[in-house]
Amino acid sequence: MQTLASRPSLRASARVAPRRAPRVAVVTKAALDPQIVISGSTAAFLAIGRFVFLGYQRREANFDSTVGPKTTGATYFDDLQKNSTIFATNDPAGFNIIDVAGWGALGHAVGFAVLAINSLQGANLS
């Protein structure tokens, strides 16, 4: 019977550690700064909504208010306008919190789409 010490082993008697290559700091930079892209697209969409499309939005709202159903001589839109103090604004054109939320959301969505499309450059998708 063989003892444990006399059994043949497959291990090397002396361990040699492989040499590691020296570490090099790798800095990954994005092609576009996300804060700049999101802020820029949101600001652009807010400006477009305020100075370009606000007149069109208000004209459509006024058209709907005159065409809508009548209750006691006044339209539903007129009745809702009497009670809506939360949408009051000091903006001369009437750009309110709903407009800011809507155009800001569109600006964010476009900004994230730009970042997503930019991140696909150089990616092997096949």
Curated annotation (Swiss-Prot):
This is Photosystem I reaction center subunit V, chloroplastic. The chain crosses the membrane at residues 36-56, 97-117. Belongs to the PsaG/PsaK family. It is found in: Plastid, Chloroplast thylakoid membrane. It is a multi-pass membrane protein. Residues 1-30 form a transit peptide. The keyword Membrane applies. Pfam families: PSI_PSAK. The keyword Chloroplast applies. Not yet known. GO terms for biological process: photosynthesis. NCBIfam families: PS_I_psaG_plant. GO terms for cellular component: chloroplast thylakoid membrane; photosystem I.
